[in-house]
Amino acid sequence: MAAAGLLPLPAAPQAKVTFEDVAVLLSQEEWARLGPAQRGLYRHVMMETYGNVVSLGLPGSKPVVISQLERGEDPWVLDGQGTELSQSLGSDHSECKAKEENQNTDLNVPPLISDEASATLTETPLRKVAEERYKTEPKVCPSPKPIGPQNAHGLNPSVPVARPQTAPSVERPYICIECGKCFGRSSHLLQHQRIHTGEKPYVCHVCGKAFSQSSVLSKHRRIHTGEKPYECNECGKAFRVSSDLAQHHKIHTGEKPHECLECGKAFTQLSHLIQHQRIHTGERPYVCPLCGKAFNHSTVLRSHQRVHTGEKPHGCSECGKTFSVKRTLLQHQRVHTGEKPYTCSECGKAFSDRSVLIQHHNVHTGEKPYECSECGKTFSHRSTLMNHERIHTQEKPYACYECGKAFVQHSHLIQHQRVHTGEKPYVCGECGHAFSARRSLIQHERIHTGEKPFQCTECGKAFSLKATLIVHLRTHTGEKPYECNSCGKAFSQYSVLIQHQRIHTGEKPYECGECGRAFNQHGHLIQHQKVHKKL
């Protein structure tokens, strides 16, 4: 006896499942109605479905739609083009009956789509397309049963119910009246119906998050308990979910079954291949609702959204510093451990971050691949180009919350904030002098070492600071880039221009503590103070 509200189907002999039995072909119009995220989901589901069917060892040539997906083409078909693919699904009752009598092989078919993906489909245009296709092309075996009265649930038990598009490998007598999907157990149907109702009766008592299935709640609880029951026999690494362990095993076996047809790169997971293919297609389906910025992966979007929320869930156990991205925390922890796993093959210099090593390689090659579109200046690092471009745009996105002063680079803001906090974390090992910026410490240490690494190619004179060399070079070139707006006089140094402008403004910021006399230059005040010392 079926449970109330559940509609049993007549038992059917077990049949082989082919890709054609489960494929959903889309027309050009239907494909156009899907958004980027839904197209990505469709690609993922179709490729995974085909992979599961192929794993059963069933014969058959590769479907056209799979070839289209592998080539990165839009997987829609012209009207009538999918007839061959769909004819086995739309046969009449006699053809269905003959097929069922001839095909009684017992196959254990794996699930073609996960519960999460199925839940996502119900909330998307892709589900709507499937529902419309289902309504117009039921693909059922007509029944001669007469129409009888409706039951208490508004259903007529005598009316033939459309079978789902998938040909079940086992008896599935319970059908969903919303979408026509069939199930072997009434409990599975009840779980499925929560997709349509939105009911989530299983609530986590720790964080309050709700789920439609108790099994999903059980997996979620392991986040709070830290339980990882699935352990790798090779290396002992443990996982919360069995599917994660299965994927991890491929690291040891070296298996990479999913290959990119564009560049030949292979991946252990289909999802990684799909993500990689967006590099070639330029697709960025994950859009931030706050600023509109788009990303090619959902995890990158989640990390980005923390910029808006200020959330920093990853904390360092050593110093308590928090980070919005786990990768940044791992890089930071190397400050405490001193680990520098990335070594330059040219000079042997080691780095704590791989991206810094890649940038360092440009020092040896001389490569400067990043060019400014405004002035043509080239840079070895993309981040340096971005900072440079703000000179042209005059953008200063990093503002101090204390005084409102804005900066071009985030590192400059960090250094500036130490003016307010008084923090000077960089200490000289020779004399104990402390500095707020690491660059200032490096420059100071040259006083003790006598190092002057910046040499003039014209006269051979050397300097401890690069900025001093740049100013010196203007002696040879005669360049005077700093011009007074009041009188037009030009200067080779910005500091000299500032001093000169005080002639026009009358500003005298340097005052003598003895007699109160003021001067427009600090050097003039020093000379004046010697008068008091002589007296």
Curated annotation (Swiss-Prot):
One of its GO terms (biological process) is regulation of DNA-templated transcription. InterPro entries: C2H2-ZF_domain (IPR050752), KRAB (IPR001909), KRAB_dom_sf (IPR036051), Znf_C2H2_sf (IPR036236), Znf_C2H2_type (IPR013087). A zinc finger (C2H2-type) spans 174-196, 202-224, 230-252, 258-280, 286-308, 314-336, 342-364, 370-392, 398-420, 426-448, 454-476, 482-504, 510-532. The keyword Electron transport does not apply. This is Zinc finger protein 250. PANTHER family: FINGER PUTATIVE TRANSCRIPTION FACTOR FAMILY-RELATED, ZINC FINGER PROTEIN 628. Gene3D superfamilies: 6.10.140.140, Classic Zinc Finger. It is found in: Nucleus. The gene is Znf250. One of its GO terms (cellular component) is nucleus. There is a cross-link at residues 99, 200, 396 (Glycyl lysine isopeptide (Lys-Gly) (interchain with G-Cter in SUMO2)). Residues 17-88 form the KRAB domain. Belongs to the krueppel C2H2-type zinc-finger protein family. It comes from Mus musculus (Mouse). Pfam families: KRAB, zf-C2H2. May be involved in transcriptional regulation. Keywords: DNA-binding, Isopeptide bond, Metal-binding, Nucleus, Repeat, Transcription, Transcription regulation, Ubl conjugation, Zinc, Zinc-finger. One of its GO terms (molecular function) is zinc ion binding. Its main location: nucleus.
